[in-house]
Amino acid sequence: MIYAVIDTNVIVSALITKSPNSPVLQVIQRIFLGRVCTLVNDEILAEYKEILTRPKFGLEKETIDTVISELQNHSLNVDAPPSGVVLPDPKDVVFYNVVLTKRDDGAYLVTGNIKHFPACRFVVTPREFLDIVDAPQRTMFVNDFSR
């Protein structure tokens, strides 16, 4: 299973995009198909709800409720201790703390705002994340070890 913390900007972009081929929409589709387990906590879920209900996005309550419910159905709730990291946007710290907590499980942080986080291999754009999720699985054979 691939674990990922999904930044709010990815969810908003997926819901307002007009392109069915948009990487942000495809990330959400992979989650809803059960190919990705999202990592959340109460603070992240509260931010999702607060941001998605902003009038400027024009999202219907039913759509918001459905998306939040589906995300929760494909999520693992993570209790993340403070890491002490300081980020340009203090509201991003919770996302970073959650991904750090699950790094031993190979978790990723998927964001449209790469520059808001420390440069590291596990902070990725939606396009990069799709490349990871959709990478073909390699089967190892005994001959692989014979060299």
Please annotate each region the language model reported.
Residues 1-3:
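Extreme N-terminal starter segment of soluble prokaryotic enzymes
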Residues 5-6, 18, 23-53:
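PIN/NYN-family metal-dependent endoribonuclease catalytic core
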Residues 6-8, 40-41, 113, 125:
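A secondary-structure boundary/capping signal
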Residues 10-11, 44, 115-116:
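Alpha-helix capping/helix-boundary segments
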Residues 42-45, 63-87:
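Acidic catalytic patch
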Residues 85-91, 114-115:
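Acidic, metal-coordinating catalytic cores used for nucleic-acid/nucleotide bond scission
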Residues 89-108:
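Acidic, metal-associated active-site segment
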Residues 104-108, 112-147:
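Acidic, PIN/NYN-like endoribonuclease modules and their adjacent C-terminal/linker elements
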